From Swiss-Prot:
GO terms under biological process: phenanthrene catabolic process; protein homooligomerization
GO function term, MF aspect, one: 1-hydroxy-2-naphthoate 1,2-dioxygenase activity
EC number(s) on file: 1.13.11.38
InterPro entries: Cupin_2, GDO-like, RmlC-like_jellyroll, RmlC_Cupin_sf
Protein name per its UniProtKB record: 1-hydroxy-2-naphthoate 1,2-dioxygenasee
Cofactor annotation: Fe(2+)
Source taxon at top rank: Bacteria
Catalytic reaction annotation: 1-hydroxy-2-naphthoate + O2 = (3Z)-4-(2-carboxyphenyl)-2-oxobut-3-enoate + H(+)
Subunit composition and interactions: Homohexamer.
This protein's UniProt keywords: Dioxygenase, Iron, Oxidoreductase
Amino acid sequence: MNSSNTGAPEAAQAATLEAFDRRAAEQYLRGQWIAEEHLMRAIGGPRPAGIPYRWEWKSVEVALDEATIALGPVDTARRHLTFVNPGLMDRGSATTHTISAGFQLVKPGEVCWSHRHTMSAVRFVTKGHPDAFTAVDGERLPMEDFDLLITPRFSWHDHHNSGDADVVWLDGLDIGLLQSLGAVFYEPYGDDSQNVRPSSSEGIGTRSHWLRPTWERGRESRLPIRYPWKEVNARLDVYDLDAGTPYDGLALRYANPVTGGPTMATMDCWVQRLAPGFDGKSHRRSSSAITYVISGSGTMVTEDETITFNRGDVISLPNWTNFRWTNDSEIEPVLLFSMHDIPALEAFGLLYEEPEAILNATPAPINPTPSLNPIYRPGAFYDQDEL
């Protein structure tokens, strides 16, 4: 059989289809056959959005100083440098495809005027001061070293530095996620400062404590919360040095103090401790993460490169990227703060991990005292989450 004759009908068919595709496009229609190649690429999982990348604190610190000179005095929340992932340059201010992070600096005496937006925000203070605070929906949240502050969606917030030294923090906002949902709203307050409650006893954040007023209905969401570092650090000391998993080391969630669930509906925050000499196992998740190095040094090893990190550095980890942590020191632990888009994926049933389920996969410690003379069935009268 003449192969050239066989190819002629196929070429004619291809030309017919190509002509149809052009006519359909003029009517803003597209055949599913055009998308088939994109579906085939998803076999085995998505392609990571962006690349693993590290921003060195020494370089960022210089850039912040230069920005201070270039901008001059400011009264807005704009002395902020966003970490733009080199693999996401077409998405604007994207550190991962869902979260944008960056450092913000407020000079002594400055007030960054009040505004609100539908993006939720976390603020991890890297250089605090006893006289600095953020006001969130009328509540004063102090900003001391390594404190974590929560600004829920559409909460009024303004930043104040009444101290005598610069204050710096790491911002994280779910901008990419909200942009993809078409849900970005913004509103300036119209004045530098919002009204602040006269007493902390009136605060919603105060009511997130485990001692709460009996005469009030409690709130579970949009809580303006501060997680003081001194309390977080004390909780780390409760756990044995080798506690945790061979993947993440000791990873503790900044839980919503009322529900016990994730930090926010769209973002979860962790503090991690990598024990001296930690050499973690490789794993990947369908979620993305941004990590700040509180102390120590080590590496994040991916399939393509080894990223070295030191104190103050920030690392972007794209979704579905194999990686593992190591701690260079045989003496000192590594401490990490990180933000994740895990809750958003969990809400849609789309959180996936390899090589095994890690998050929420291990039962909580069981009652260590079984009955010596059993009368009832083991586990009788227990709750399901105890079994």
